[in-house]
UniProtKB/Swiss-Prot annotation:
This is Prostatic spermine-binding protein. The gene is Sbp. Residues 1-17 form the signal peptide. One of its GO terms (molecular function) is carbohydrate binding. Residues 18-151 form the Jacalin-type lectin domain. SMART domains: Jacalin. Residues 160-279 are annotated as: Disordered. Glycans are attached at residue 62. GO terms for cellular component: extracellular space. Pfam families: Jacalin. Spermine-binding protein is an androgen regulated ventral prostate glycoprotein that binds various polyamines. Prostate.
Amino acid sequence: MLLLVTLALLAGPTCRAQNILGNNVGTYFYVAGEEHGQLRGIRIFLTVIDLIKGIQLRFGGNWSDVYGSRSLKYKEFLLEDGEHVTQVSGTRKLCLTSLSFTTNKGRVVTFGVRRGLSFNESGGSDKYLVTVNGLYAPGLCLNGMGFKWKNIHDDFDDNDDDKEDDDDEHDDDNEEDHGDKDNDNDHDDDHDDDDDDKEDDNEEDVDDERDDKDDDEEDDDNDKENDKDDGEGSGDDDDNDDEDDDKDDDGGSGDDGDDGDDDEDDDGGDDDNGDEEEE
């Protein structure tokens, strides 16, 4: 079992180092960050005697970690829009002594000093450099380097896929917008229905108020007529009472006249009796 584990550990670096140019000894590294975009810049750290000590790549607008070692002495190369690395060459001894990068626009940049055994790597006319891997001796230098290439036509396929995805997302967004718009229209319809119901309620309330007002006015008119009738009835009764009182008074006065006549008759009788006595 221990033997199998040992073989597996040894096989890992060996397999990974098969495509590495230079010395196949040291600590393996792979420059990650390609998910952030295409290769847009290269920064190489150098030793005092211009050996390749460390490397850092820029993907899109992001710089990767430094693989190998940093140093105060470094050089960088930035790619223009639409520019890609199409070829890499270099020289090596125990360490990498130089690296040269050629672009599709014909520009060439060299890091370090060319000395030692040379090597050359190209993905072909229709490929460009994506990222690099390699081996390094910690604190000393880079021992070897490998290169990952990508077919330029894959970008068109990826762009088409991205465009289709964008179109699908756009369609989904449009459908969602239409759905939201329909919901808004339904909501507006509900508001309109609520407003109509509110107007109907207001009209009903106004009609009820008018009916109540008419009823109140009718009641007031009836009350006034009743009061008027009561007042006229009371006046007639008072007049009748006054007439009866006057009539009674007149009757009493007649009686008094009769009494006066009776008194006169009595006086006349007395006079006649006196005359008879004198005779």
